[in-house]
């Protein structure tokens, strides 16, 4: 059992995920902290509260963006 997804433009197979899996499971598999990322699933931004109910299926397209602090102080 595995799940193949297009993640940030690259096709990746996740051997530990099966179909269907939740977006929450993928975020855990990637070891990402949910408070500093945004996720787009098949062209739609997914609010964090909906990650556990968002079902991933074979071939889904995801974009995961990390927020980074920075800048200068004047």
Q: Which role does the model predict for each range below?
A:
Residues 1-74:
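Ubiquitin-like/PB1-type beta-grasp interaction modules and other compact soluble beta-rich domains
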């Amino acid at each position: 059992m595995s799940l193949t997804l297009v993640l940030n433009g690259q096709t990746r197979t996740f051997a530990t995920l099966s179909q269907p899996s939740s977006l929450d499971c993928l975020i855990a598999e990637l070891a990402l902290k949910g408070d500093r990322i945004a996720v787009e699933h098949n062209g739609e931004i997914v609010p964090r509260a909906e990650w556990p109910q968002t079902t991933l299926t074979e071939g889904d397209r995801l974009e995961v963006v990390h927020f980074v602090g920075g800048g200068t102080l004047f």
